[in-house]
Amino acid sequence: MKLIIGLGNPGTEYDGTRHNIGFAVADALAAHHNASFSKEKGRYLSAKIKLGSESVGIIKPMTYMNHSGHAVVAAMNFYKVARTEIVVICDDLNLPVGTMRLRPKGSAGGQNGLKHIIECFGSNEFARLRIGIGSQNMPKGGFSSFVLGKFSEQEKSEIAIMTVSARDCAIDFALHGLGHAMNHFNTSKL
């Protein structure tokens, strides 16, 4: 079994925000496979799909971004999945809109959801798919309002394409493994 974990904040007020791009990819993956989310023990929503012979859980933590690690650990324990069988999908302020990077490990890079997962694991060795939300237009000192803000009209078309690419990358990870997905989906710009 594999887990595809999209990070974000619960609540309709966060729908469509830069910080919730992980939720958007999880939603796109579930919709692509006609799956729906159900609540699991209050910490996360999950949808289950089958990709070939592989069972896949799509997870959306309901603990808010800064406490994502609690939900990720709960889901991994429930499904009895190792760190090598997960990919975490999140926003990356340092990547331009229209780019994504899949990595086998690394630092949190300022992403508080990843930071909390690393703290809960005691390790940074887990796959993460970072999706660029761009910081070039961020007002000085406006970090929170920027990541919790919505994409511009111009960015929305790039994000729609990127969401589909990220969804397909997650599918590739589940079917063929991390190395294969990295070779096929790491981009400079789509």
Swiss-Prot record:
GO terms for molecular function: peptidyl-tRNA hydrolase activity; tRNA binding. The keyword Transferase does not apply. Its main location: cytoplasm. GO terms for cellular component: cytoplasm. It holds the Pfam family Pept_tRNA_hydro. PROSITE patterns: PEPT_TRNA_HYDROL_1. One of its GO terms (biological process) is rescue of stalled ribosome. It is an enzyme of class 3 (hydrolase). Its EC number is 3.1.1.29. It catalyses: an N-acyl-L-alpha-aminoacyl-tRNA + H2O = an N-acyl-L-amino acid + a tRNA + H(+). The active site is at 19 (proton acceptor). It is found in: Cytoplasm. The record marks 91 as: Stabilizes the basic form of H active site to accept a proton. The keyword Nuclease does not apply. CDD domains: PTH. Monomer. This is Peptidyl-tRNA hydrolase. It comes from Chlorobium chlorochromatii (strain CaD3). The gene is pth.
